[in-house]
Amino acid sequence: MQLPEEFVNYTRKLMGNELFQHYLDSFSEEAPVSIRLNPLKVEGGGLKVEGGDPVPWCPEGYYLPKRPNFTMDPLLHAGCYYVQEAASMFVSHVLRQYVHTPVVMLDLCAAPGGKSTAAIASLPQGSTLYSNEPNRNRANILLENITKWGYPNCIVTNNYPKDYRASKLRFDVILCDVPCSGEGMFRRDEATIGEWSKQNVERCWQLQRDIVSDAWTCLCDGGLLIYSTCTFNTKENEENVRWICEEFDAEVLPVDVRPEWNITGSLLPDFSAPVYRFIPGITRSEGLFVCVIRKKPSPTPSLLREGIKGGKRSCLKEIQMNQQHSYLPHREGPEVGLSYPQAIAYLRGEALTLPADTPRGIVTVTFQGHPLGMMKNIGTRANNLYPKEWRIRTTHVPHEYQSVL
């Protein structure tokens, strides 16, 4: 794998020879595979990860010994777990440290939904999450993942940051996982190497500042901005954090981490604020940068709930979840358990013949007790109501079920 020469020269100088060599060595290793369990569905349900090592900063996270065929696991489609890179689970650790009462949170650049599902599972009960994605196609993928995750207190929107600024909605916590040059993903996604350039780095840090500027107006006094990228360079990381602090008179907050997690701090000599950098070969993860920034309280207290009520949610493009598909653990109506071959057939959109004593009408079909979706039983057969855009498209079906959990 050939890394861009300009990237190598800059990053070696930034990290130092020893750290950079560990990073280079990581390319000869298999990238770790990790999942995060859904506490709404798994806790107390007897599901566990066989042979998986815990992700130390996320109690629901596990490293897997090898990468299974996730597509062919009905429990993935049921929202029992989410396949997520381990470093990205760090957002749950941040939220659990700083958020202890119900809040309204915005994930501004949320697709495909990993950090949103981690956030909604980590926030105190009674919280609300706005999960937003500007790109329409990616927003539909986000909607699918949020729906399957099964938390009712999540609103999916398809808007640009400037639309949120115009809405006058206010949030206690805003996650800005901003578009970036992707240097931290080089090992996992070789295509990102070909997309990298110094010019793209320049475009990214400027775009990131525009996004943060829009987000900042939506943040309540005393609220938290979680700024993250999946890149290494300081222009998109430390230098942007310093700009945020100077531009908005903000302060950086520390996050409790353990030495054995091998998370790296600031790489900018004249910048000592607490930031958290995950480097492949050092940390058991791909690349990530995280910083927690607090908007200083105003001399005049702001009332968040009044701000939410006074905002213009109607001006946002909200995407409605499919009301026929409930992924909540507590549900009403008849249910039919499916075998593994039946579950795969259902997820492929095929019609099924249900047991003779199945009531006519809408029926929830489940796998190992977890709902996959709905069918309409008309007696001679059951019509498949699983959304077409969610269906498994591969024709290969394994002979036996290889469970992840």
List each language-model region with its residue ranges.
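S-adenosylmethionine
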Residues: M1-L405
